[in-house]
């Protein structure tokens, strides 16, 4: 929260130091190169690597398939000479959103059974600075880009935000609940 002192923040970070270091190693956090949405590019889905394959065929509408570690995008032949980066980006964003709908619903249900709490409402969207948020109106928002990480990571973020329904802070009681 905005009123938290620097010392309080430092205490929490220090108390979670081992966990933070373990997670940094686990996820190998490093600056990521911006996606170019090109054939052969690697994307993460639920913690697994998938490679983008772009094809052009005699069809009317674009198609996206995800299977066997591949994201296959088939575009109409008439698009072959154009820059399709924006369309491919939109298709991949929609793919992540659709995955998020299923995965977040599952994580919400699992967490509801575990802690007996559920939000009034939840949303899925891109958030620039957080994996999830919980508003004072008890609305949880989950970042659709979280779908790049494992189900355990998704379940943790959902649990974290649901615990904010009871404790709208990062107090000791909040962390005990998490």
Segments predicted by a language model, with ranges:
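Walker B catalytic acidic pair
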Residues: 161
